[in-house]
């Protein structure tokens, strides 16, 4: 649950020294080579929620609970990519932040990005460094914080297979420890070991939607167009275009829960599969 608090972090620039939101963890930016990139990418400072979005806070914001596996502290699931964007905007408005997404034409499958100073740009041109509200992470950002970021680099643990460990059972709910049993379901967040940044459930429990749009080439392989920090295909006006998901879920095997595994799903269709899909919010600071 998000509650307004004041917490200071050392090493942050003057004028940007306070965090107003409980359970939002400061993640220092840096440079690294993502698993899918041929070169280093830069990540700027962000705040990341400790947990996937829970049903409790979703219900408070959206006034409904679509989840198949009910429980206040379980991740919300059965949520589409577009619904996750809507949640981010409503949460931003609740706390007086400028929403990131222009969703007035979302029913047509059209998305625009709202940068600061009332600048509205197409998704492939967006610079999230110039946004204020809550949003989905890019895949570059997701791999950075799931791997432990700069802290893990300094500790020599950045290359863990899973988020926080090479032992999946320490950090993840997945097929072997929950998914293969008759009562298989999501689990309450925060019950497994956190990663180096204090983030929970990046591996397993629910897949996490990322911002990035995915297209396939003629061979059925992922087709990405490089654009600064983002890996964004420019077919942003297609509502059913595939979007990136990361981290695996309660119903997946260990390979799917690895940090560097790349999953995807359609933005609005195949609703029956959405019980595997949740999301985690981030915010530029």
Model segments located where?
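Surface-exposed intrinsically disordered loops and tails
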Residues: 105-123, 127, 183-188, 218-235
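Residues that flank catalytic or metal-binding motifs in active/ligand-binding sites
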Residues: 23, 28, 42-44, 72, ...
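Structural recognition of the beta-strand scaffold that forms the well-ordered cores
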Residues: 25-26, 49, 77-78, 135-137, ...
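Conserved "repeat-terminator" motif of extracellular CCP/Sushi domains
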Residues: 2-8, 90
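Surface-exposed recognition segments
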Residues: 150-151, 155-156, 184-185, 202-285
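Short, well-ordered surface patches within globular domains
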Residues: 32, 71-170, 209
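Short, well-ordered junction/capping motifs at the entry into regular secondary structure
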Residues: 120-129, 168-203, 266
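A short glycine-rich, aromatic-capped structural motif
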Residues: 15-67, 72-93, 145, 203-204
